[in-house]
């Protein structure tokens, strides 16, 4: 890709006035080389930080860079694109018949029973705090064994 040249160089104009050695006059805002940093603007003029011309070149360069990136990404996506062939026989695309309702219900009940068995197998009693067993034995002796058994409730049975 060739670098963009300013319009005045393409038109064949001489550009800003120069002295015998090819340097611009000291009060000029032009640069002798493209790679040289811009000269400070004369006092009282309002320019961007890069100067009016540099800012437009910067935006042009940014735009060209973004175009290159977009083109490269587009090519890369095209290279990675897979081809998809559809079969000529449309009957092979017909959906499979649905299973009867009984099969679905049986599958559901099988899954549910296996999950319930797993849950029951993984259950454990919560640990008692330190000294908890002695406290329970003391309460049992004080209140009497019969009264505690009368107040005890049965845990619900799991229907799984």
Curated annotation (Swiss-Prot):
UniProt-listed InterPro entries: GoLoco_motif, GPSM3, TPR-like_helical_dom_sf
A GO molecular function held by the record: GTPase regulator activity
Compartment(s) of residence: Cytoplasm
Pfam families in the record: GoLoco
Location of the region described as Disordered in the Swiss-Prot/TrEMBL record: 1-55
Residues bearing the modification Phosphoserine: 35, 39, 56, 59
Pro residues: compositionally biased ranges: 35-44
Record PTM Phosphothreonine, positions in chain: 62
PROSITE patterns attached to this UniProt entry: GOLOCO
Segments of skewed composition (Acidic residues): 7-22
Amino-acid biosynthesis keyword on record: no
Expression (tissue specificity): Expressed in heart, placenta, lung and liver.
Keywords for the protein's UniProt record, in alphabetical order: Cytoplasm, Phosphoprotein, Repeat
GO biological processes: positive regulation of cytokine production involved in inflammatory response; positive regulation of inflammatory response; positive regulation of leukocyte chemotaxis
Main location: cytoplasm
A cellular-component GO term for this protein: plasma membrane
Domain GoLoco residue range list: 62-84, 104-126, 132-155
Its job: Interacts with subunit of G(i) alpha proteins and regulates the activation of G(i) alpha proteins.
Comment block on domains: The GoLoco 1 and/or GoLoco 3 domains exhibit GDI activity towards GDP-bound G(i) alpha protein, but not the GoLoco 2 domain.
PANTHER family in the record: G-PROTEIN SIGNALING MODULATOR 3 (PTHR47617), G-PROTEIN-SIGNALING MODULATOR 3 (PTHR47617:SF1)
Protein name: G-protein-signaling modulator 3
Species: Homo sapiens (Human)
Gene name of the encoded protein: GPSM3
